[in-house]
Curated annotation (Swiss-Prot):
Keywords: Ribonucleoprotein, Ribosomal protein, RNA-binding, rRNA-binding. Disulfide bonds: none annotated. One of its GO terms (biological process) is translation. One of its GO terms (molecular function) is structural constituent of ribosome. It comes from Legionella pneumophila (strain Paris). One of the primary rRNA binding proteins, it binds directly to 16S rRNA central domain where it helps coordinate assembly of the platform of the 30S subunit. Part of the 30S ribosomal subunit. Contacts proteins S5 and S12. The gene is rpsH. One of its GO terms (cellular component) is ribonucleoprotein complex. Belongs to the universal ribosomal protein uS8 family. This is Small ribosomal subunit protein uS8.
Amino acid sequence: MSMHDPIADMLTRIRNGQQAKHQQVTLVSSKLKEEIARVLKEEGYIQDFFTETLPNGLKSITLKLKYYHGRPVIEFIKRISRPGLRVYKSYKDLHSIPGFGVAILSTSKGIMTHVSAKVKGVGGEVICEVA
């Protein structure tokens, strides 16, 4: 069975892993997933992540989930732009996310938060929102 939206799958695994109080989640790796994980780590939503090559040649990425006083640090994580409906924003249209959250964007200068994109004056595809 093919997966139509691997980013939505990644976000769902994070959401489900935190609801089940798992310490980590593992999924098939890609450059985009690694960059999203890097932004989540920089923003303090996950403890760490690492990639490894499996014996069958596939790369996997493991995300170490983060909790604060037993509660998940990520209150919500939502896919915005999806294969059937791409969402693009100019840097002028980037607004704050409720609850001190961030939007993660794919821009011409790489994957970054909406705050970084606004400072650099670039817009792009809004991948997801996290708070």
